[in-house]
Amino acid sequence: MSDAEFVSRHLHPGDDLSSFSSDQPSLDEWLRQSAHHAESIRSGRTWVWTQDGSVVAYFTLAGHVFERHDLPQRIGRGSPDRIPAVLIARLALHRHLHGQGLGGALLADASRRIIVAAEIVAARFVVVDVIGDEAASFYTHYGYRPIPGTRRLVRKVSDLAHDFRSD
């Protein structure tokens, strides 16, 4: 199965989210109980993949700001005191899609949208707060670097853009 079989679009108010199950209850509950509210108050923008009208994957993006002193010196060097970023607040695939290599495609979809947004509104980093070691390993595989002492990983938007230009 390829990501070409899915429609990637913004979350619609009428989307039925009740059958989404990623095997991560906190991600499933947030989608069902909070995604529409986050949209309405503009605290997060959720994009979904649909297949035959059903939501089978999603990610949520939000604005974020780092304090330079919260970053390792090698990452924050040359930055202002407050550094604009994009937070990948949520990213999940329905459990029936696990193990098919689609997590990377979903992250690439989110990354493309971040690159476009960063052309309009400045963002130096992409940040993700991981739930566990498996998620940390996933993001590390795609070039994200951990911030010591946290469950947070970061990647420069310029590095993302470079990777997509190289493809």
Identify what each model region corresponds to:
Residues 99-113:
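Conserved acetyl-CoA-binding loop-helix of GNAT-fold acetyltransferases
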Residues 115, 121-149:
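Conserved active-site alpha-helix within GNAT-family acetyltransferase domains
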Residues 42-63, 70:
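Conserved beta-hairpin
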Residues 1-23:
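Conserved N-terminal entry element of GNAT/NAT acetyltransferase domains
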Residues 16-33, 44-45:
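Conserved GNAT-fold acetyl-CoA-binding loop/helix
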Residues 107, 132-135, 151-158:
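Short glycine/proline-centered loop/turn elements that form peptide/ligand docking sites
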Residues 89-99:
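A short, internal acetyl-CoA/4′-phosphopantetheine-binding micro-motif in the GNAT/acyltransferase core
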Residues 58-90:
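Conserved acyl-donor/pantetheine-binding loop and adjacent beta-alpha core of acyl/acetyltransferases
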